């Protein structure tokens, strides 16, 4: 089986209206057409993912809130056999994170997030919350809900320091 992973990219697969705002309907229709084309070709529509936060990320991305609106419209418009996997994903230093959607807790709108892949396998499938932000375009930069930092941040810092030390040690041995 052939499967497709497709990046959600501004200026390529997302369209803006005359005011520069994301055109949710037109952008979603672009993805719906792609999903139907994949089905006709026998290609599985595996996933839609956000551009990695590297290089020209600011040019190719849109706010996560907008991307979530497009994804939800695509997901609800395609036949089940033509749909992408259930969630939008984005890679971060901590791992591959899915945006499950939004929830409201005590009157506050939040993003629900989950690790699909992680630097520490104990983080896998763990759901956590971050404050809803209409402008943020990177999952790793979302503000944690109910805490000063995300549950994984201290351990991630330790992992990254160990990796750095290991690389430096290897360099000095050569």
What are these regions (language model features)?
Residues 1-30, 44-60, 90-91:
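Conserved strand-turn element in the central/C-terminal portion of the radical SAM core barrel
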Residues 36-174:
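Auxiliary Fe-S-binding modules of radical SAM enzymes
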């Amino acid at each position: 089986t052939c499967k497709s992973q497709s990046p959600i990219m501004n200026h390529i697969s997302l369209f803006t209206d005359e005011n520069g705002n994301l055109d949710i309907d037109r952008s979603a229709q672009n993805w719906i057409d792609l999903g139907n084309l994949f089905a006709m070709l026998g290609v599985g529509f595996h996933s839609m993912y956000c551009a990695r936060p590297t290089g020209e990320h600011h040019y190719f991305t849109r706010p996560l809130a907008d991307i979530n609106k497009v994804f939800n419209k695509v997901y609800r418009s395609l036949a089940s056999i033509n749909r992408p996997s259930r969630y939008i994903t984005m890679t971060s230093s901590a791992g591959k994170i899915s945006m499950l959607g939004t929830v409201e807790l005590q009157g506050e709108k939040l993003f629900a997030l989950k690790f699909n892949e992680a630097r520490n396998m104990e983080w896998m499938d763990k759901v956590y919350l971050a404050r809803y932000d209409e402008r943020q375009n990177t999952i790793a930069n979302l503000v944690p809900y109910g805490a000063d930092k995300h549950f994984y941040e201290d351990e991630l810092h330790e992992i990254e320091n160990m990796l750095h030390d290991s690389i430096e040690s290897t360099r000095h041995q050569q």
